A protein has these predicted regions:
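Short, low-complexity, charge-dense intrinsically disordered segments
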Residues: 1, 227-237
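Conserved N-terminal beta1-alpha1 strand-loop-helix module at the mouth
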Residues: 2-95, 100-103, 110, 117-118, ...
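Short, electropositive alpha-helical surface patch
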Residues: 91-99, 194-203
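Short, acidic/turn-prone active-site loops that include or flank metal/cofactor-
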Residues: 99-101, 123-124, 146-149, 205-208
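Short acidic loop-to-helix transition motifs that present clustered carboxylates
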Residues: 125-127, 186
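Glycine-rich beta-strand-to-loop/alpha-helix junction loops that act as flexible
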Residues: 179-184, 202-206
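Acidic, divalent-metal-coordinating active-site segment for phosphoryl/phosphodiester hydrolysis
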Residues: 184-196
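Catalytic cores of soluble, metal-dependent hydrolases
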Residues: 191-192, 200-201, 208-210
């Protein structure tokens, strides 16, 4: 069963990469109760990024434990042979990297045919112009604000102007494409990412490294709401 896609203005997507895997079911239930909108699942192959994590079997297990949409991020080379595996496992959103896919239009179309929402991710040094040709095929753009592979890194501030540029491209296209930021997101800096134009926020240690997930997520929402309001007012002027 694919989780129902909810649609609040701003979404928090806790990354289970930073969860306690010995208590993964409990952790997933806890972040759902704490007010998460998505659950972010990082899949790493040890080639595209220097780390090896999980696959469809864990996604399937997480799917059984929550009704939230599963936001699955494939940090892997040649993801195409595995798309149907993640669809069967229960992924709601499946994101591939522009740097890792040869025929991006075809891959995104196949993700949609399999009943999932299609996402495209860019590494910090990848120029935004590379995603413009596929905006009609994407439901979500994920901007990495750290170099992918490991949790607990600090946000690269130079990524913020890139988020602004991608937001401009999305507005120009006139499609409801979500703009997600992933890497180093915490209570203290989530407002800057929202001000730049992001509307989905992945946070691993920024949530799972705190004592009270609900308090942390509530604080994040307080920090993003005024920032987005300020940004919208400037666009209207």
């Amino acid at each position: 069963m694919v989780g129902k896609i909810v649609n609040p203005v701003m979404k928090i997507s806790p990354s289970i990469l930073s969860a306690d895997f010995a208590r993964l079911g409990e952790e997933v239930r806890a972040i759902e109760k704490a007010g998460a909108d998505y659950i972010h699942v990082d899949v790493m192959d040890g080639h595209f990024v220097p780390n090896l994590t999980i696959g469809p079997f864990v996604v399937k297990a997480v799917r059984r434990g929550t009704s939230l949409p599963l936001d699955v991020h494939l940090m892997m080379e040649r993801p195409d042979p595995f798309l149907s595996d993640f669809a069967r496992a229960g992924a709601s959103i499946l994101t591939v990297h522009v740097e890792a896919v040869t025929h991006l239009h075809r891959t995104l179309s196949e993700i949609r045919k399999l009943g999932m929402r299609a996402g495209v991710s860019l590494n910090p040094s990848t120029p935004p112009c590379l995603i413009e040709p596929v905006l009609d095929y994407a439901d979500l753009i994920l901007v990495m604000s750290v170099n992918p592979g490991f949790g607990g890194q600090e946000l690269i501030p130079e990524v913020l102007p890139k988020i602004k540029e991608i937001r401009r491209l999305i507005v120009k296209k006139g499609r409801p494409v979500e703009l997600e930021v992933d890497g180093g997101i915490k209570v203290e800096n989530i407002g800057a990412a929202a001000k730049a134009g992001a509307d989905v926020f992945v946070s691993g240690s920024g949530i799972f490294g705190t004592k009270d997930y609900a308090t942390t997520i509530a604080a994040m929402r307080r920090n993003i709401s005024p920032r987005r309001a300020q940004s919208s007012q400037r666009k209207a002027l």
